[in-house]
Amino acid sequence: MSTHNFTVTRSSNRKHLIAVIDGPNMSSLGKRSKKVYGNIQSLDELKECVRNFGEQLGVEVENFSSNHMGDILEYIHESAHRVDGYIINPAGLTTIGEGVRHALEDTELPVMEVHFSNIAASAGAARGLGGGSIQSSFTHTATGICMGMRHYSYLAALTALTLALDDQSFLGAPSGQQ
């Protein structure tokens, strides 16, 4: 999977480190509905796509994936002191991942929630899941959300988070300290 070359004008040349976390069932990419998940053949292919896109943005991407909530919690605890923000696809933890959400919230770092599908779409919608909308336990504390755009949701989240990290006034710094 190749990414397209593009130019984004950033207000900083700082090389942010952004952690991308993929939760349970993301290891099954390539075996799931093409309508929802597109042509990504594997989780490794997705990771490479996001990492390459990060290089174009001038940021470092660190990928982590697990089918186990405890492993994800340990990763968040271990990485919080060295990363600048998180992108998470909670996947199988979307409705039950309170522990992961709390751990992310405790880091006080920006968090982008991503989904291949539009989890808020009604049943049968073009980018929705077959069963209709679901309520994410992450959405109400996420800094931002990108969903319904397959792997492009990750690229949009990476772009938005990078630009937000560059803009000190956006993520809470007093406006006079830019």
PLM region descriptions:
Residues E78, I96-T107:
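Short Gly/Thr/Asp-enriched flexible loops that form oxyanion-binding sites at enzyme active sites
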Residues L104-G124:
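Short, acidic/small-residue loops that bind anionic groups at enzyme active sites
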Residues L29-D44:
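Glycine- and acidic-residue-enriched helix-capping/strand-helix junction motifs
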Residues S79-Y86:
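Short acidic/histidine-rich motifs immediately flanking catalytic phosphotransfer sites
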Residues N63, A121-S175:
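Short, glycine-/small-residue-rich phosphate/pyrophosphate-handling segment
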Residues S2-A19, R101-L104:
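Short amphipathic alpha-helices and their capping/turn segments at secondary-structure boundaries
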Residues P24-M26, A91-T94, S117-I119:
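Short glycine-rich anion-binding loops that position phosphate/pyrophosphate groups of nucleotides
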Residues E60-G70:
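Short beta->alpha junction loops
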